[in-house]
């Protein structure tokens, strides 16, 4: 059986709920959904899918605004309604953001270059790592000056298993 070699996108692994379906989920199910979507996204990033974190990860559900605005407060709630699950999840997102620096899947791959780690020590790698954040501006600032923003994102970020093995042998 021949398998397709098409690239996956976040939409391919994204589960969409109707507003009615979303409202029937309890807070534990909503948290599980968020965790699974974050994991799906992290897997795509780990294989070279370079894009800002989709807003859907930081949303309560279809038709609702992002959970976080400037400073991490919910953007929209019903008038006079306290939404404790929003605040609870907001705290979890803060914890997640704090732990992001420790997660290996944050790196996306740009090209073969010599890198300097945070201590300034050079190392030869097969792909240049760019550490992602939830904002494109942060990624843009970390791109080398000789990469144009447009060129970097039009470039294919596919890294086949055979190339990966070859890179490991070169180290």
From Swiss-Prot:
InterPro entries the UniProt entry points to: KRAB, KRAB_dom_sf, Krueppel_C2H2_ZnF
Pfam families for this protein: KRAB
Occurrences of domain KRAB (ranges): 8-79
Tissue and organ distribution: Expressed in brain, ovary, testis, prostate, tonsil, heart, bone marrow, colon, breast and kidney.
GO BP annotation list: regulation of DNA-templated transcription
Database matches in PROSITE patterns: KRAB (PS50805)
Superkingdom assignment: Eukaryota
Official protein name in the record: KRAB domain-containing protein 4
UniProt source species: Homo sapiens
Gene, per the UniProt record: KRBOX4
């Amino acid at each position: 059986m021949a398998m397709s070699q098409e690239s996956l996108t976040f939409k391919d692994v994204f589960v969409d709920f109707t507003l009615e379906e979303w409202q029937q989920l309890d807070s534990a199910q909503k948290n599980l959904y968020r965790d699974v979507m974050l994991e799906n996204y992290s897997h795509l990033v780990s294989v070279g899918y370079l894009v800002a974190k989709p807003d859907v990860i930081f949303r309560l559900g279809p038709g609702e605004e992002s959970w976080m605005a400037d400073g991490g407060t919910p953007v929209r709630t019903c008038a006079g309604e306290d939404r404790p699950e929003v605040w609870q999840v907001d705290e979890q997102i803060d914890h997640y953001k704090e732990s992001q620096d420790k997660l290996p899947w944050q790196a996306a791959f740009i090209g073969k270059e010599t890198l300097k780690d945070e201590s300034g020590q050079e190392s030869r790698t097969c792909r240049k790592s760019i550490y992602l954040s939830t904002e494109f501006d942060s990624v843009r600032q970390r791109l080398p000056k000789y990469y144009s923003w447009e060129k970097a994102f039009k470039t294919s970020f596919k890294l086949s298993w055979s190339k990966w093995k070859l890179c490991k042998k070169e180290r």
